[in-house]
Amino acid sequence: MKQYLDLGLKLKKVHRALEFNQSPWLKPYIDLNTRLRRNATCKFDEDQAKLMNNSYFGKTCENVRKYKDVIICTDKESIQKLMKKEKCDGWTTYNGNLAAVLLNRNVVKLDKPRYVGTAILGISKEIMYDFHYNYMMKEYANVKLLFTDTDSFCYHITTENDLYKDIKGNAWYDFSNYLEVHNNFDESKHLIPGYFKDEFAGQPILEFVGLRPKMYSIQPLEGAKKATAKGVDRKVRNEDLSHQDYKQSLFGEQQFTHNMVRIAQEKHKLYTVEMEKKSLSPFSDKKYITRNGDDFTTYSYGHYRISNQ
């Protein structure tokens, strides 16, 4: 809240407040996994240490009220007996002699520290907002945010200086993935949480095309594009969709469809499904879109600038 107020948020009313004590009791565990990750000798050990940190967030956010018990039955009498219970929440019959009955639990043990997940999200947002508002927007007057994800930003930066000289040695960045011959290479922050890494390792980006949330394509100076399209098979995204297709969809207001094949299962029986699915679309009902030549700007509905368009 203090950060939001410093950034200009107007607080009109406080409905209720919580008082609590804070301490970095989780820090030794996070630091341990960070050291294990940095000292890992193979990709598996590195990913395992990373998972131990990331999965902690998910485990603290679990809703234990949704836990169920599954009973496997092989005779009709047992199935009927369980189905008559008040805590029965459903059942699935696999064949004439096998069924699974879903039961709600009699006792729910509220043993998950839900506040931990809330605190992790809050601290993460504080770091992200601090970087965007207090560094990027102050350092580059004409910076434009292209998209953001949970822990990443994509910017269009206009500057008269050499951008790589600007950011060299900056406390916000981790340059450990740069080539060793690059002037900015520095592995002192390698795999340490809390720093921003250049996803293209010092390679300039030629073009960015954003269609909708989680549907964009980035074309670097060299190498293959990085593209996302939510709900689209990886094979279609990497092999069938080109960066030019994203541009054609945006400027030509054209929708693309592709045939996709996936493996599905029902009652533990596997089968393949072929479907024709929309892969690219420039239409979005979640944002107000303005256009100035080849430049598009989106605003959330209710934004004060919309009335001036």
Where are these regions (language model features)?
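Conserved acidic
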Residues: M1-Q309
